[in-house]
A protein has these predicted regions:
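NAD(P)+-binding Rossmann beta1-loop-alpha1 motif at the extreme N-terminus of oxidoreductases
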Residues: 1-69
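Hydrophobic beta-strand scaffold residues
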Residues: 33, 53, 118-120, 161, ...
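Helical "substrate-binding/catalytic lid" subdomain
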Residues: 169-294
Length: 294
């Protein structure tokens, strides 16, 4: 087992639109990389690289010191982590880049610890273009020394890399980010529709707002999609719904009057406990516009 980050052997599972560019950046940074995918065709884009392929997650684990997992949801994450724990040597590290419930990461971290393996959560934000440019936001939770151990690998595709606290803290930050993005999508659609009804050209209004204090990443996405959420909902609605459901579940368990947190007026009447009602109401409105209500 290598113990210094500059000699790390990296395994990567989850080579989709987000994970694929991340894996390529690690390879281009010079790390020895092993890949695994359920479908052999997923590995074809890496034929021009020095990456090796494994026949199973356990085989990948046996050839790795750090394993990055970037799969779709909680069930896939649990399945992959359980599989790699069968081959990863004590002292190895698993970084969960998937966006999942914090409790999923906490549970998996306990299983890993029982085998002498360290697990951190490190969800990312920014999409494929940011990954390709090495500008993904990485939100890390877990043992801080372990996060620092992984930082040079994360830096091949991420900047900034933010340490947030214990295992699960990264997921909480990512889910809040995604809930805010969902809410902003709905606000952007409403803003552009109101502007049209008042006689202002939609594209010119979007250009103005993009240079003002009301700008948001969501506004850019909505404007480029013609001022509606139809296309965004078709491609990402189910994932946004998943994340809003997860943060709503967390909000329902947030202790009343948590230290440092101010209650929102009328929260209790929104069914979201004392915290997060305004955020979740706006996110729910956006999901409804995408026809994927929570």
């Amino acid at each position: 087992m290598n113990t210094t980050s500059d000699t790390l052997r990296v395994g990567f599972i989850g080579l989709g639109s987000q994970g694929g560019p991340m894996a390529r950046r690690i390879i281009e940074a010079g790390y020895p990389v092993t890949l695994w995918a359920r479908r052999p065709g997923t590995l074809e884009p890496f034929a021009d690289t020095a990456a090796k392929s494994a026949g199973s997650p356990a085989e990948l684990a046996a050839a790795s010191d750090l394993i990055c997992v970037c799969v779709r949801d909680d069930a896939d994450t649990e399945e992959v982590v359980d599989a790699v724990l069968g081959g990863l040597a004590a002292g190895g590290v698993i970084a969960v880049h998937s966006t999942v419930h914090p409790d999923t990461c906490r549970r998996l971290a306990e299983r890993a610890q029982a085998r002498g393996v360290r697990l951190i959560d490190a969800p990312v934000s920014g999409g494929a273009p940011a990954a390709e440019a090495g500008r993904l936001l990485v939100m890390a939770g877990g043992d801080e020394e372990t996060v620092e151990f992984c930082r040079p690998v994360f830096a091949s595709y991420g900047d900034p890399i933010v340490y947030l606290g214990p295992v699960g803290a990264g997921q909480i930050a990512k889910l809040l980010n995604n809930a805010a993005f969902t809410a902003h999508l709905g606000v952007a659609v409403s803003l552009l529709a109101l502007g049209r009804s008042l006689g202002v050209d939609q594209l010119r209004l979007a250009d103005v707002i993009s240079h003002g204090s009301g700008n948001s990443f969501a506004l850019e996405r909505v404007a480029s999609a013609g001022g509606t959420l139809a296309r965004i909902g078709e491609h990402a609605g189910h994932l946004l719904r998943k994340d809003v459901r997860l943060i709503a579940d967390l909000a329902a368990t947030a202790p009343a009057g948590a230290e440092g947190g101010a209650s929102e007026p009328g929260d209790a009447g929104h069914g979201h406990g004392e915290h997060g009602a305004t955020l979740l109401a706006a996110a729910d409105a956006a999901l409804a516009l995408m026809n994927v209500g929570r």
